[in-house]
A protein has these predicted regions:
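Pre-Walker A (Motif I) flank of P-loop NTPase domains
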Residues: 2-5
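A glycine- and Lys/Arg-enriched "phosphate-lid" helix/loop adjacent to the NTP-binding pocket
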Residues: 91, 98-162
Length: 199
């Protein structure tokens, strides 16, 4: 029997990485993240996030992320799921729709078509959105310059947040958690929803 694929989404500073890692540890699942979870992905991550002085169009940024995701799906995620292992992801395709689509203005129809090419039939069984205002998320993050995406202004991150909320309203198998609560409160809400899955 194939494993479950659960993905955590949210703006930077929402706490999604902490919760994804926690759930993977508690459930004995494979923790995966994007971008940069493979040797190829490490190189792509450098260009996507860390090469902040390199001019890059939103479409180029999206295509690099999709290249990383395609390789990640075929080399890590699908083999793990096929072997019966649960996979807990820190970001998946919704991140590209939210950040490069709603945030950067890349055409959503074109992004969806490219996403289909990148991931094929691989879909999460559940996507958990940890919703948090950009102002609070910014206060929670370490006070550094951030990468190419983290360093964008609050208006950009608000567009991303609204994009996520729109995806949660219109797509199947999403669960929205109020990220403004304490870490134990957020964890309890997540665990209550996860208990409904056929682990």
């Amino acid at each position: 029997m194939a494993g479950l694929f659960v993905v955590f989404e949210g703006i930077d500073g929402s706490g999604k990485s902490t919760q994804a890692s926690r759930v993977a540890h508690q459930r004995g699942g494979l923790f995966v993240f994007e971008p940069g979870d493979t040797p190829m992905g490490v190189d792509l991550r450098h260009w996507i996030l860390e090469a902040v002085t390199t001019p890059m169009t939103p479409a180029t940024e999206a295509l690099l992320l999709l290249a990383d995701r395609s390789h990640h799906v075929h080399s890590v995620i699908e083999p793990a799921l096929s072997s019966g292992r649960h996979v807990i992801g820190d970001r998946f395709y919704a991140s590209t729709l939210a950040y490069q689509g709603y945030g950067r203005g890349v055409d959503l129809g074109e992004l969806r078509a490219a996403t289909l090419l990148a991931i094929g039939d691989c879909r999460p069984d559940l996507t958990i959105l940890i919703d948090l205002s950009p102002e609070v998320a910014n206060d929670r993050r370490a006070r550094d310059q951030g990468d190419r995406i983290e360093s964008a202004n609050l208006e950009f991150h608000d567009r991303v947040r609204q994009g996520y909320l729109e995806l949660a309203r219109t797509e199947a198998d999403w669960f929205v958690v109020d990220g403004a609560g304490s870490m134990p409160e957020v964890a309890a809400d997540i665990d209550e929803r996860l208990a409904q899955l056929p682990w």
